[in-house]
Amino acid sequence: YTLSFQFPKLCFLFPDTALYAGEWHILPIGLSSNAVMNTPTPYEYIEVSKIISLFKKRSKFDHKGLFGHGLLVAGSYGKMGAAVLGARAALRTGIGLLTCHIPGCGYEIMQISVPEAMARVDKNAICITGVGDFETFDAIGVGPGLGTDPDTFGAFLELVEKCGKPLII
């Protein structure tokens, strides 16, 4: 059990050292909020209450089309598990629709593992060689399990250069 004045210490937040702190609590010591807000620091600490306030309340009549359509470019032969995990994570963010652009070898894996995501198959069976049209998407994620094939790298560079959408790499 650890008490810390005003802010958590950085070591509380790392796996190697958090074990030694155990459960911790912050004790305010009356620092000026102006001084706290204007003191430069490379770190930001966000509490759960702040994150929860960012979530939109959904009406019982809301529909998936109102919450964005994302594209996840992921997977290669032997690495489809990463694509599946990425798709599940994207869906947990609250996105309305998710399309996964995957190599041909991953079609059945994706459809069975994440049936709520739509699958769009690359022309190549083992890796990503091009992303195709991405204009209809609100945001794009790229990376999980892509591998190191030169054609995939070319497709990645083309996407980064041409994408005018929010992009998560």
Task: Name what the model sees in each region.
Residues 1-6:
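Conserved phosphate- and dinucleotide-binding cores of soluble alpha/beta proteins
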Residues 7-169:
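Small-residue (G/A/S/T)-rich helix-start motifs and N-terminal tracts that mark the onset
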